[in-house]
């Protein structure tokens, strides 16, 4: 254990997240995902179950209805699967949205 006496102010601990809208980043990922999944050839039982887990806050675009950040958690916990689909489809817009969300928020 370190005996250092570094004081970290609470308002400084998450400075790197300042001005980043992780809810909106997650919404953009889901926007792209739902657009891609409209094509029947791109969907399967996994994605059908995934869609059921999308919280109401996404559909209302109201982050206040998502205080536990369920949407961000859903996106971040499935990053590999989402990115695999986006890359398989070769959708640059979707890949960019997922990359941004992953880098800034996950």
UniProtKB/Swiss-Prot annotation:
Keywords: Nitrogen fixation. InterPro entries: CowN. It holds the Pfam family CowN. The keyword Lipid metabolism does not apply. The keyword Transferase does not apply. It comes from the Bacteria. GO terms for biological process: nitrogen fixation. Is required to sustain N(2)-dependent growth in the presence of low levels of carbon monoxide (CO). Probably acts by protecting the N(2) fixation ability of the nitrogenase complex, which is inactivated in the presence of CO. Belongs to the CowN family. This is N(2)-fixation sustaining protein CowN.
